[in-house]
A protein has these predicted regions:
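Non-heme di-metal
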Residues: 1-137
Length: 137
């Protein structure tokens, strides 16, 4: 449960990044803010399915999220917003694959369905970025 809950925290980091891009590229703010909302939605769903609220789980996630965020922002710091969004589109597809990989480990059809929905939501943001980027470059 801790890994999906940790992924939920990373989704929130991505949501924050989308909000920054909305400020940087205001003519596309509406679509980018929809992507941010999708990231928050995925995080909410993951936290509902995999709450990971045990103190040791929370402590481990708190210890790991800082370095993970630092790495995420460090990778992006040398890239233009357009390059960052191209990387993010790929990350969204990797996220979709991660949620789908968890389906095999679940026996509850409701959780399997929720994970598939989360993957589809990830792909919606990737599709948005893939459509947006050619017009920005």
């Amino acid at each position: 449960e801790a890994v999906p809950a940790f992924l939920a925290r990373l989704e929130r980091t991505a949501a924050d990044r989308y909000r920054l891009w909305a400020e940087a590229v205001p003519e596309h703010a509406e679509g980018l803010l929809r992507c941010a909302a999708r990231e928050d939605d995925i995080a909410d769903r993951a936290e509902q399915i995999y709450p990971a609220t045990a103190p040791e789980q929370v402590a481990a996630m708190e210890a790991a999220i800082g370095p993970a965020k630092d790495t995420y922002y460090e990778v992006f710091s040398t890239l233009t917003p357009i390059e960052q969004m191209a990387v993010q589109a790929k990350a969204e597809r990797q996220g979709a694959a991660a949620w789908r990989a968890m389906i095999e480990t679940e026996s509850d059809p409701a959780i399997q369905s929720a994970l598939e929905e989360m993957a589809t939501i990830e792909e919606a943001s990737a599709d948005y970025l893939d459509a947006l980027l050619p017009g920005l470059g």
